């Protein structure tokens, strides 16, 4: 009897694979195939037959020897083992005993045997099957040099074509290399990216149309660019160039009620639209506002190069202008604009995420999404409202799309660092200051306030001299009752240090190293402090309780509040706004009005009281313009939709100079904060900005 296992037989193979499959392989039909496998052919050459080998360690067939497995030890002689094996492993359906696939190798004088590895048996069977199936799959077509393919027509065939040789010859392409075919086959097994955004229209903007608009008034003008579709704008960040048209769908909200006609014009690249009926000389169509179905236009891509760069704005424009109003009474409707890419739209030339392109990017992130992140660029508190003005101005910390400023401060709030050289004279409260060397503009500290005092005062000791009747704890009653010597200055907390404080003579002065200072831009001389609207290193003054001896102090200041002058917001009077040379300004244009962003500044002396402060930009807008690389034509606006919690909304447009505009002469006082901002694209500055708000005659404070 065997002491370990029996020899590998067909019965073992049935267990490893499947009994039915192996039964089919051993002489029976397998599906539609007829394959017979002789197991002796898997390992032994034909001339060896089924004889046993008596010298396995000097095998004449090295490949056969490599398939030999573990040595098995038996007590009984080979003949007895063979008979026992046949008796214990059953028979096939035809009565034939299950014999071993390969007779064991024997070593003369012992009863040690070597059996074939099971994996080698399975591999041999699969190899035979592969060869057999390959012969069946081989093409039997005649592929000589005269062989051609011919195409079939999609429509009814011509009666003249009676043989296949008369069809249209389809040119054969060179067959891809096997490695390329393998790559394509692997890639095709993955799930392709869905492109449903190519088929549906996405909201872009809304347009207000009033019957008071004159004929030829441009309501909408849009140059072809990926930024007018939210999905194209998102994907464009991965590419350097684009090409193709965009479909635009207009839906008039007053359809069936609101009368009048509009003209849709296609303006070629290089031509700027004007508000005149002469624009109808360009290709155009007219559509009636009373029609209930949306109107779809396609902005075609007219170009002289293969692709457009992402900043290119000299492209085909779609212009919507008033052709004819249908009523004498004032009525208004809203036109919803939606976009989708045309079938020929495509991107090209991938670029790494985050890489900068020299021509500039789309100005889509100048205003933070949530108003909780809106700080002013004049004062560091949160924006709480807007003020629409016919004229807006600011120099310091105001940046344009060229990343330039006419001011002296960086777009960050940092402590003001100055040096004060005190000379004791008759006045020991007003002092000139010297800026540190790391200032943006030499001689002027970074962050120095940009307003001056309202009027000339004596350079003497002062206090909060608010006479009775000036303020009633809520608001200013009579501005004339303000006799404070340092009104109009900014109140700063300080950290002051004195050189060599360990000296005995400086001990008393070192006790004053941290005291409140009042700073301003003014002209100090002849015991007088005069207003100065042009800043320079000689016009920087501070008011504080100075030392009683000559010494030099270094001070780090942090603005905390403002010494109240009157009931006017800080920065609302251009005569008190400080500049280096010129003062950047913005005026009403194209029915759009410039705005200040309003926040609150603490007032000195009055407990928990604040006053309004006007800012020309949101601080993050200043930061992005100073550090970024944005592309915006001089006659265009980067448009953001501002929406409050009650679904009121209005558009803010930022022009190339960095100033902001709205399309209303007043904004409602009941906007519910926080607000949200959404980038809507770029439009002409002459086109009125859209809105949907309850208009009042009061600006937000």
Swiss-Prot record:
Belongs to the caliciviridae capsid protein family. The record marks 152-153 as: Cleavage. Keywords: Capsid protein, Host cytoplasm, T=3 icosahedral capsid protein, Virion. Capsid protein self assembles to form an icosahedral capsid with a T=3 symmetry, about 38 nm in diameter, and consisting of 180 capsid proteins. A smaller form of capsid with a diameter of 23 nm might be capsid proteins assembled as icosahedron with T=1 symmetry. The capsid encapsulates the genomic RNA and is decorated with VP2 proteins. Homodimer. Homomultimer. Interacts with the minor capsid protein VP2. May bind to VP3 and Vpg proteins. Coiled coil: none annotated. The keyword Transcription does not apply. The lineage of its organism: Viruses, Riboviria, Orthornavirae, Pisuviricota, Pisoniviricetes. This is Capsid protein VP1. GO terms for cellular component: host cell cytoplasm; T=3 icosahedral viral capsid.
